[in-house]
């Protein structure tokens, strides 16, 4: 296990199993409600589904999933495997979710006590949705920023992060630049989580 990536370990295999199992399962459709109290879900574009936070202070909180090109929210089972391995208590952790999308990964970290979580997203509609969610949860540790995830990592103070979360669009050229930038931003003993369409060999990371 290196400080720069979760690789060459049982957790990698377990996450891949969870990803494979979840791939066939569609995101749960949003139930129709006349008086929706969940403003974040109500703010989601037509056709949106939802996923849920699975641990911590916001356990079972619904997160909207908009029908946006390339948006792939990390399924519950995958997040459960990841965060069970990282630990239920992330108190004091500094985290950056570089391609936040629905915010599922970063909000999960904040729910488990992370001291600071920066959600970076380039899609304006998703940024607005994340801002509504942050306000609804009164998540003072969470900051939402519109922009490029790789640039955000490059701008981070070197060795300042305990957890870097990378789930970039699979059809974009983001993997190597994000890993390189993340390796500079993550502290000794910290971790980078990468979701990718293929397995990466150790020498590539």
Label the model's feature ranges.
Residues 1-205:
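Class I S-adenosyl-L-methionine-dependent methyltransferase catalytic core
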């Amino acid at each position: 296990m290196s400080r720069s990536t979760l690789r060459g370990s049982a957790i990698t295999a377990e996450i891949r199993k969870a990803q494979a199992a979840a791939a066939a399962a569609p995101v749960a459709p949003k139930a129709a409600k006349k008086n929706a109290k969940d403003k974040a879900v109500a703010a989601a574009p037509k056709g949106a589904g939802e996923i849920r936070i699975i641990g911590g202070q916001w356990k079972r909180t619904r997160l909207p999933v908009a029908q946006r090109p390339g948006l792939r929210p990390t399924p519950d089972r995958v997040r459960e495997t990841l965060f069970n391995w990282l630990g239920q208590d992330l108190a004091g952790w500094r985290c950056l979710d570089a391609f936040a999308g629905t915010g599922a990964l970063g909000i999960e970290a904040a729910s488990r006590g992370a001291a600071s979580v920066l959600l970076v997203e380039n899609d304006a509609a998703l940024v607005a949705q994340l801002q509504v969610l942050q306000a609804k949860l009164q998540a003072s540790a969470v900051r939402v920023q519109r922009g490029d995830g790789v640039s955000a990592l490059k701008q981070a103070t070197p060795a300042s992060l305990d957890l870097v979360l990378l789930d970039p669009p699979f059809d974009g050229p983001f993997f190597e630049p994000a890993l390189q930038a993340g390796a500079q931003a993550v502290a000794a003993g910290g971790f980078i989580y990468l979701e990718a369409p293929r397995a990466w060999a150790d020498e590539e990371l």
